[in-house]
Each structure stands twice: as structure tokens, then as C-alpha cells.
Amino acid sequence: MRDYIELTKPRITWLILMSTGIGYFFGLPQASNWLTFLKNIDLLRLLHTIIGTGLIASGTAALNQWYEREGDLKMHRTAGRPLPSGRLIAGRALAFGVALSIAGFVELWLGVNLLSAGIGAFTLASYLFLYTPMKRRTWWSTTVGAIPGAMPPVIGFAAAAGGLTRESWVLFAILFLWQFPHFYSIAWMYKEDYARAGIQMLPVVDPDCRSTARQIVIYGIALIPVSLVPALLGMSGRLYLVGALLLGLWFLYSGVRVALERTLVRARGVLITSVLYLPLIYGLMLLDRPGL
């Protein structure tokens, strides 16, 4: 059982569900106080949304590991996973991933709405059939993978609102831009592993990581104005505006440091900052929602 759980990548799934929940809450009508806001929450629909999205995310993770099992065997970081280590056979992992994915789609379709199920299906398909094969061909795969990676809040928003508005795409944009410093820093730290597996991440084709550091800074700069848009649209207030600006500058600072001193220590600093940034900005966004 533990090996099957590991196939679902629980830590990544938790991040996905956090983003889905934020999207759901911002898809609800604005309320004048917390009591009214809580009354607007359809707990059963929220539960179906979380379960369905979690199943699709888990199924996608399992299918991704099934597809990459041979490459994972060549990487120190992933050689101990259930498939390359031989603890699970490929056929069972494939069946497990397919079953979870289908169950997640059905859960969203029947328990929530067709729109959220469709977005979930698009997320799975684009991740598995576009991003995953591209990883061995070009470092631009990170850009392609950031699209399905930013879809969880859109699923949540569609589940609550029954449609998509500019607010849902603002949440998408924040998560989309956030992924580049996050994943480039991971690829930087494990570039030798990725090279052994033949995965064309940017730090692999950019051995001195000069371009990688530049990309981290560029996306850090871009994230700051985009992260302020929720305040301009009335999704959040002044507290969020100030907090998002400070968080963005902090995130950018970690990127500038790695650009000035291209070391593993600085790359790890970007990773740690990115992991802290997302829940902090989500928390501020929700805490400072107008009327609450």
C-alpha cells in the first residue's frame, strides 16, 4: 500500500489541492462577513471537487512515473521509487494510474460539473501527452508543463462558479509564473541526475546556469505585478497588496542572489523561498478578501 501511495506523490498532490481550494473560494460570491461567506460554501460540492481533483492529480502522477520508469532508474533522486526499484510491476502501476484518473474525471463530472471535469481531463492529457514526452527533447517542456501545472485553481473556480472569469485566469497566471523559479531551482540542484536520464532541462543544456539564473530573475520580476492584480480587481484589499509586493520582492531577491552567485546553495535558497511563497500569498489573498 505504501508504494501505491508513493506513486501518487502526496506532497505535490497536497499543493495541487491547496491551489484548487483557493480557486474554489474565489469562485464563490463575495460576502459581507465571514458568516455569510461560510454559508455560501456548498460543503458537498467542495468535497467532490477536492476528491475529484485529488484523484486526477494522483492518477497523473502514477502514470507519469509509469512512463518515466526507465529514466528514473538512471537518476539517484528517483531510483528508489516503486517502479525503478522493482517494488511494483509496471502493469499494476499503469492500471492504478488509469483507474484513479477515470475515477477523478467521473467524480468531477457527476459530483461537480462538466466544466471542471473537462479542465481536469485537459490538465491530465496535456501533462502526460505533451509535457512528459517533451522533457527528453527540449528544455521548453517546462513552459508547456507550466500550463497544466497552473490549472488547479481554475478547476476549483469552475467548480464553485460554474464558469470562468478574469479572476480565475489571474489565479492561473500567478501559479504559472511561480513554477519557473521553483522548477528551475530543482533542475539546477539535480542537473547531473537529469543529464544521466537524458532529460533536457534548462540547467542541463546551460551548464554554467547563466541562462537559468536569468530566467529565474525574469519570472521573479514578472510575478510581482501579476501578483498585485487581485487587489486591483477587488479580489483582495490593501493588506494583500502590501503583502504580495513584499513577498514578491523577497522571492525576486532570492533569484537575484542566485544570479550573482550561481551555486547550489543559492539555488536551494530559491527553492525554499518558492515553497514558502505560495501558501503565504494564498493565505494573504483569502484573509484580505473584501467584506471578510
UniProtKB/Swiss-Prot annotation:
Cellular compartments annotated: Cell inner membrane
Protein name: Protoheme IX farnesyltransferase
Keywords linked to the UniProt accession: Cell inner membrane, Cell membrane, Heme biosynthesis, Membrane, Transferase, Transmembrane, Transmembrane helix
InterPro entries: Protohaem_IX_farnesylTrfase (IPR006369), UbiA_prenyltransferase (IPR000537), UbiA_sf (IPR044878)
Entry similarity comment: Belongs to the UbiA prenyltransferase family. Protoheme IX farnesyltransferase subfamily.
Biological role stated in the UniProt entry: Converts heme B (protoheme IX) to heme O by substitution of the vinyl group on carbon 2 of heme B porphyrin ring with a hydroxyethyl farnesyl side group.
Pfam families cross-referenced by the UniProt entry: UbiA (PF01040)
Pathway field: Porphyrin-containing compound metabolism; heme O biosynthesis; heme O from protoheme: step 1/1
Matches recorded under NCBIfam families: cyoE_ctaB
Gene Ontology CC annotation, any one: plasma membrane
Source organism: Solibacter usitatus (strain Ellin6076)
Note in the entry: Carbon 2 of the heme B porphyrin ring is defined according to the Fischer nomenclature.
EC code(s) of this entry: 2.5.1.141
EC class name: transferase
Gene responsible for this protein: ctaB
